[in-house]
Amino acid sequence: MNSSAKLLKEEILMYLEELSQEMGKENLKGEILVFGGAAMVLAFNSRPSTKDVDALFQPKSKIYELSKRIAERHQLSPDWLNDSVKGFINTDSFNYKLFLRFENIAIYVPDPEYLLAMKSISMRLGIESSDLEDIKFLIEYLKIKKLEDIFNLIKKYYSREQIPMKTYYALEEIFQDILDNNP
């Protein structure tokens, strides 16, 4: 695999298990809370791949160090596992559940409601982004029937000031597309 390739579910799980083994060699235990495309791939099977694993993790510096070793070993991007999502996370306001436990690392995913809210405020537009498809999937997964309910859900986690205008416009368009395709 080269550094620009997408990560398939099986590959992500393999690298996370390898990370767990590396943690065990150092007598450490860790936790990883997965967000973004990796959560969509792992927990929801909504798409086959993602470009990286956006997550919060502990112990942070050790997991970073070990993930870099795995990247070198498998010719992955050095930031295949990263915490760049942290700027969009309000850690006090959402629930998460255990997705998978390896011997030395527990993998968690946020509730789909929070994932929808977070993806909505952090959405990227353009052909390289899967955010619009992820948002549409989560709206349908949660069986949301009214646009107003989506905005109310987002406001449970983020203040009105944190919601970009593009979110309002994009969600209106996504919701209309859902209605048009599911009369």
What feature does the model see in each segment?
Residues 1-183:
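Compositionally biased terminal segments of proteins
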